[in-house]
Amino acid sequence: HGRGRVSTETAAHIMQIAKELGYEPNPAGKALAARKKQSHVAVILPSEGNPFFDEVIRGLQTSAEFYSSYGLKMELYTMKGYNAQIQLDILNRVSQSVEALIIDPIDDESIREALDKLVDEGKFIVTVNNDASTTKRHCYVGADYENSGITACALLAALTKARANVGIVLGNRQLLGHCKRLEGFFQRMDSLPDFHVAAVV
């Protein structure tokens, strides 16, 4: 089991015998061993009043139920809207009791600093739906928002024969994904001389 209680030579000999006998680790045994030490994962989502997250939460709960036999415990924390202080308060409250964190982060310096601090403390951080790409987070699960902005502009240009004054309704500037989508739109628009944005609201 690689816990360092036997010599390297003995371990190598045991592994060779196991290989010759076709030994395969028992998943059920692993699950029983994992139960001795639970892994806690906190999930923080701005999901209250936002049906977009219904399927996300359902998927998380299904996965948590499946992996619970392997010692995984998921704790879901929800909030309404995009108040950075509220999200930071939740982060500070749960961070010391978990080994990993899944979060839809608000694009605020206080949140970025908190995520970096958690990574430095050895926590595994996954951003979902919106990224915090300038942080030390381990991975991001979500859309390529900049490319979606480029695509939106290209489609609109095709529909208007590249001559238009456009009004853009943006969701929330506190979300990096929304800002990236706008950046992508303007990036594509740079090559369209008769295409203009009248206002962004």
Name each model feature, range by range:
Residues 11, 53-61, 88, 146, ...:
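Short, surface-exposed alpha-helical segments at coil->helix boundaries
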Residues 60, 152-195, 199-200:
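An alpha-beta-alpha
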Residues 103-147, 158, 165:
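Flexible loop/hinge segments that line or gate small-molecule binding clefts
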